[in-house]
């Protein structure tokens, strides 16, 4: 009954206030008077730029409707004077003074100086100012100026239409400054401001605007969805935004950002999922932004056609700013800074940004007496202690007779400006004056609603209090119902029931679902967007519980689906289940002891990990190869996402790939992922491949690039191939990296070749995951020795001019260090002379010697065996330590034979596919040359002598001739 009574009471008050609001004549007339014209007007915003133009833009599309040219907002000198240069801010008229090449902010602005003038500063500066007000009416549809009203005269250009004409008020402030000691030093400025500050600022505006500091580039976002609505380039710095309504201008808030920062935002806005949150849109509280965490305040000093100016703007960590500490002469060393740990520095100190140490002459204003000004971004200056004393005072009441004493208030110093906080009050007073009855009706409704909320909270408190008296509790959920987290509130232990099954919950733990529990106090790690990883249990097994905010439930489900498909591989983190409550999603994952980043940075972790470093690298590559074979691109490979599991019952540890939150599947029939709004710019700064930033699509090579950075990071104990974090991503885009620290490794040539191939700027030229696994860097000693023997057998009987022999003997003297006989020990040298002759500069003969000594190892003299060491490790190291380029050289040369059955286990399919057309072409050329040579030999061979048949003689004729006397 009580609940029904309160409900009916609340509904009655709500209906009563609504009827009063609707029946109010003023309220109804105001709303009826709002026709199509006002709706069109309210959707128009006016953008004021420094050159004096007022542009009307459509608030939905950003399309320019019309332009009105007025006087420039700011006119100031463009020259720099010693000790007498002021930089005005065109946004609010605040002033900055340049002294000794250092900027300081004055505690007053131009309008305040004009109101207080004539006045004198404590630094000897004399101030004089004037003010001029003017009203002008415009047609909101065309922007045509209809009428001008001022104290001097009233000009009417065309007949004014009271229904359509909107009057805008503008105030012109002129201020002059004089040095009382030096009359040659003067400074003048004119500042124009519109009268929008007299009306309440629109706080419920559905859009959020950002403007650049040095040109008129504007970005507009939807506050609720975070979607970018439109962009516009006005070519001149923006100084103010107004909402155009029938009652005048309403000032709109906007953020000023650096030009380079705006370009980065515009370039990445469709690819970075985190930009809406970074920019402060699509948040629970629109006024609460994370700009201070991502951007930093700075002062931009610029130059326009109307003089020098300064605007406070937000910049990112890549923007170079000038520090006043480095622009002046060297100073005495100050006190030592407070000693802070690295963790305290990250928590309390802002991140460093680059500082210009040399003055670029192209952006410097200099004077003959040594004063100079740098155009660009400066560290936000400190405020000076300057004050001004007014020289005249308002006289209260009527004037007294001549000779009487006028009581004047004591002089007051005009110091730092305190922000006026009367906007809310003026807005409430405006509602009360224009619509009193709806105002009071709204108050009554809010009061009734407050009583209802208090009553409902009290009722829930009573129910919770009665529930807390229970000794234990059970939850029985049917399949398909939503699961919620529960925890026991008993002193020692509670019980948790699921389908009448009781599970004990340790004190301080939380239970989600039937089998999953976690400890909120035992945090294993944190991620972006509120993701936290806790230690927990799943069905009695220790697991890591990853908690994801419900707003990102789509990503949590996608991660769970990808894990279900890929966690059968031993080097992909195992997935157990996913539970949910009203606020979060919980993923139960395999518990690991450390990440690869912990392994590199913490020595105690290295002592507890039993797996070799090279095995960690190979297993991580194996897991990545499995993902790529499953058509999955990880997109966030970094040392923190390569984990080392707990030791198994056999004491074995494994390296696994984790964090599938940014993974994407390559669709069937495609080879890449398009970079759209849904896909976004994925990855972690410093580990992102260059094509992610500059290409329209990405694919598997992005993971290979990140893995190459990880390899170098691990092999060099924490060094990144692209340098320090500040310039790392820029170096990645430019392809500037160094691998000089690999020279300390025994296999430096193999490591250098592997990582260089993985960091290639061209994605198509990078190795695949299978090719990385087949690289000789990961071969065991047995496999390397067997490879040398197989190559030696292959080229033993080959002719010297055969393709494979020519490849092996190319640059042979570099490979064998001039002559390999000079690098081996005397015992082995003498043993080689006993059997056959070897060429000291031939790689093929070196391989033959290694093969023969390996096959006849037991027959070698004792001193030779001691020099060579045991097979395979010491024997192999004997030769590779003397000839470090040998294995890589032979591996590259013998790619020609990768398609042969003997070498298929040494090369990946990618190498065979790459070499197949080369081998085919070379074989075709060889065959053609042989045919031409055969034809040439046949053509040059001597012709055989013709054999003539002997003549048969007639014996009868011979007889006749021999015996002529016969007859």
Curated annotation (Swiss-Prot):
Q: Does the keyword Transferase apply?
A: yes
Lumenal-side positions: 22-438
Lineage summary: Eukaryota, Metazoa, Ecdysozoa, Nematoda, Chromadorea
Regions of compositional bias (Basic residues) in chain numbering: 957-967
Q: In the UniProt record, which residues carry a glycan?
A: 100, 188
Gene designation: ire-1
Q: What is this protein called?
A: Serine/threonine-protein kinase/endoribonuclease ire-1
Q: Where in the cell is it found?
A: Endoplasmic reticulum membrane
Catalytic residue positions: 636
What the entry lists under Pfam families is as follows: Pkinase, Ribonuc_2-5A
**For this UniProt entry, what is the primary localization, expressed as one broad class?**
endoplasmic reticulum
| Superkingdom to which the source organism belongs | Eukaryota
Which InterPro entries is this protein grouped with? IRE1/2-like (IPR045133), KEN_dom (IPR010513), KEN_sf (IPR038357), Kinase-like_dom_sf (IPR011009), PQQ_b-propeller_rpt (IPR018391), Prot_kinase_dom (IPR000719), Quinoprotein_ADH-like_sf (IPR011047), Ser/Thr_kinase_AS (IPR008271)
Activity control, as annotated, is:
The kinase domain is activated by trans-autophosphorylation. Kinase activity is required for activation of the endoribonuclease domain.
Originating organism: Caenorhabditis elegans
Q: Where is the signal peptide?
A: 1-21
Phenotypic consequence of gene deletion: In combination with RNAi-mediated knockdown of atf-6, causes sluggish movement, arrested development at the L2 larval stage, and lethality soon thereafter; larvae have intestinal degeneration and develop many vacuoles in the intestinal cells. In combination with RNAi-mediated knockdown of pek-1, larvae have intestinal degeneration and develop many vacuoles in the intestinal cells. RNAi-mediated knockdown restores fertility, reduces the accumulation of unspliced tra-2 in the cytoplasm and suppresses germ line masculinization caused by RNAi-mediated knockdown of rnp-4/RBM8A.
- Give EC number(s), comma-separated: 2.7.11.1, 3.1.26.-
The catalysed reaction is: L-seryl-[protein] + ATP = O-phospho-L-seryl-[protein] + ADP + H(+); L-threonyl-[protein] + ATP = O-phospho-L-threonyl-[protein] + ADP + H(+)
Q: Which GO terms describe its cellular component?
A: endoplasmic reticulum membrane; IRE1-TRAF2-ASK1 complex; neuronal cell body
Q: Which family does it belong to?
A: Belongs to the protein kinase superfamily. Ser/Thr protein kinase family.
Record field: compositional bias (Polar residues): 479-494
Names of the cofactor(s):
Mg(2+)
Instruction: Give residue ranges for domain KEN.
Output: 781-909
């Amino acid at each position: 009954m009580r609940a029904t009574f309160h409900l009916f009471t609340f509904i009655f008050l709500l209906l009563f206030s609504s009827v009063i609001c609707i029946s109010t004549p003023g309220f109804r007339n105001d709303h009826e008077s709002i026709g199509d014209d006002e709706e069109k007007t309210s959707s128009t915003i006016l953008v004021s730029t420094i050159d004096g133009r007022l542009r009307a833009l459509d608030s939905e599309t950003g399309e320019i409707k019309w332009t009105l040219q007025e006087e420039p907002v700011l006119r100031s000198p463009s020259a720099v004077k010693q000790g007498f240069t002021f930089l005005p801010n065109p946004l609010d008229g605040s002033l900055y003074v340049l002294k000794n090449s250092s900027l300081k902010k004055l505690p007053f602005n131009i309008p305040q100086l004009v109101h207080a003038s004539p006045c004198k500063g404590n630094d000897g500066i004399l101030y004089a100012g004037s003010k001029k007000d003017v009203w002008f009416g415009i047609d909101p549809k065309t922007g045509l100026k209809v009428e001008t009203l001022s104290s001097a005269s009233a000009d009417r250009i065309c007949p004014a239409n009271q229904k359509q004409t909107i009057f805008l008020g503008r105030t012109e402030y002129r201020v002059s400054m004089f040095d009382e000691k030096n009359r040659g030093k003067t400074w003048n400025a004119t500042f124009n401001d519109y009268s929008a500050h007299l009306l309440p600022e629109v706080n419920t505006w559905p859009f959020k605007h950002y403007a650049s500091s040095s040109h008129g580039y504007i970005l507009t976002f939807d506050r609720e969805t975070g979607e970018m609505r439109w962009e516009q380039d006005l070519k001149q710095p923006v100084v103010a935004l107004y909402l155009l309504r029938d009652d005048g201008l309403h000032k709109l808030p906007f953020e000023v950002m650096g030009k380079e920062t705006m370009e980065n935002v515009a370039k990445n806005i469709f690819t970075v999922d985190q930009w809406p949150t970074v920019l402060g849109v699509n948040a629970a509280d629109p006024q609460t932004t994370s700009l201070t965490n991502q951007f930093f305040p700075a002062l931009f000093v610029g130059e326009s056609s109307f003089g020098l100016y300064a605007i406070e703007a937000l910049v990112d960590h890549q923007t170079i700013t000038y520090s006043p500490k480095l622009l002046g002469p060297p100073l005495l060393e100050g006190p030592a800074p407070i000693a802070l740990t690295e963790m305290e520095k990250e928590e309390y100190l802002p991140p460093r940004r680059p500082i210009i140490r040399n003055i670029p002459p192209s952006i410097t204003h200099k004077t003959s007496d040594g004063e100079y000004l740098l155009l660009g971004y400066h560290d936000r200056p400190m405020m000076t202690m300057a004050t001004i004393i007014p020289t005249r005072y308002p006289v209260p009441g009527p004037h007294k007779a001549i000779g009487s004493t006028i009581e004047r208030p004591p002089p007051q110093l005009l110091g730092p400006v305190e922000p006026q906080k009367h906007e809310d009050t003026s807005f409430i007073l405006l509602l009360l004056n224009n619509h009193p009855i709806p105002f009071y009706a709204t108050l009554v409704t809010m009061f009734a609603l407050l009583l209802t909320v208090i009553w409902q909270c009290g009722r829930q408190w009573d129910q919770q209090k009665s529930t807390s008296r229970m000794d234990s509790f059970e939850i029985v959920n049917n399949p398909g119902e939503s699961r919620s987290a529960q925890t026991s509130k008993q002193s020692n232990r509670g019980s948790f029931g699921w389908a009448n099954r009781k599970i004990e919950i340790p004190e301080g733990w939380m239970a989600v679902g039937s089998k999953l529990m976690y400890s909120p106090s035992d945090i294993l790690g944190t991620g972006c967007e509120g993701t936290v990883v806790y230690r927990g249990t799943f069905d009695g097994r220790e697991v890591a519980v990853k908690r994801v905010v419900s707003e990102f439930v789509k990503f949590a489900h996608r991660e769970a689906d990808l894990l279900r498909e890929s966690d059968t591989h031993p080097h992909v983190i195992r997935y157990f289940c996913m539970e949910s409550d009203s606020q979060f999603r919980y993923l139960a994952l395999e518990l690991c002891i450390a990440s690869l980043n912990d392994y590199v940075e913490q020595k105690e972790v290295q002592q507890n990990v039993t797996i070799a470093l090279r095995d960690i690298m190979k297993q991580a590559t194996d897991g990545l190869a499995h993902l790529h074979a499953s058509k999955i691109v990880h997109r966030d490979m970094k040392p923190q996402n390569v984990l080392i599991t707990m030791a198994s019952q056999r004491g074995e540890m494994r390296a696994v790939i984790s964090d599938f939150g940014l993974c994407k599947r390559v669709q069937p029939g495609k080879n890449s992922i398009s970079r759209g709004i849904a896909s976004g710019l994925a990855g972690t700064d410093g580990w992102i491949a260059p094509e992610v930033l500059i290409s329209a699509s990405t694919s598997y090579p992005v993971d290979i690039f990140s893995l190459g950075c990880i390899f170098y990071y691990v092999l060099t104990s924490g060094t990144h191939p692209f340098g320090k974090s500040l310039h790392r991503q820029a170096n990645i885009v430019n392809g500037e990296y160094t691998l000089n620290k690999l020279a300390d490794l025994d296999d430096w040539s193999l490591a250098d070749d592997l990582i260089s191939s993985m960091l290639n700027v061209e994605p198509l030229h990078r190795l695949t995951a299978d090719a990385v696994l087949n690289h000789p860097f990961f071969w065991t000693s047995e496999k390397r020795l067997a490879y040398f023997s197989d190559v030696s057998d292959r080229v033993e009987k080959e002719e010297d001019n055969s393709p494979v022999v020519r490849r092996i003997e190319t640059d042979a003297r570099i490979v064998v260090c001039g002559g390999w006989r000079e690098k081996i020990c005397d015992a082995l040298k003498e043993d080689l002379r006993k059997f056959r002759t070897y060429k000291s500069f031939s790689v093929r003969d070196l391989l033959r010697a290694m093969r023969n000594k390996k096959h006849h190892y037991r027959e070698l003299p004792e001193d030779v065996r001691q020099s060579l060491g045991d097979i395979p490790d010491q024997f192999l190291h004997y030769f590779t330590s003397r000839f470090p380029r040998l294995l890589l050289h032979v591996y590259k040369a013998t790619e020609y034979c990768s398609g042969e059955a003997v070498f298929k286990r040494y090369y990946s399919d990618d190498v065979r596919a790459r070499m197949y057309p080369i081998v085919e072409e070379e074989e075709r050329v060889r065959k053609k040359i042989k045919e031409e040579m055969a034809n040439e030999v046949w053509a040059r061979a001597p012709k055989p002598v013709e054999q003539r048949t002997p003549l048969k003689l007639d014996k009868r004729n011979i007889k006749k001739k021999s015996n002529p006397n016969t007859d």
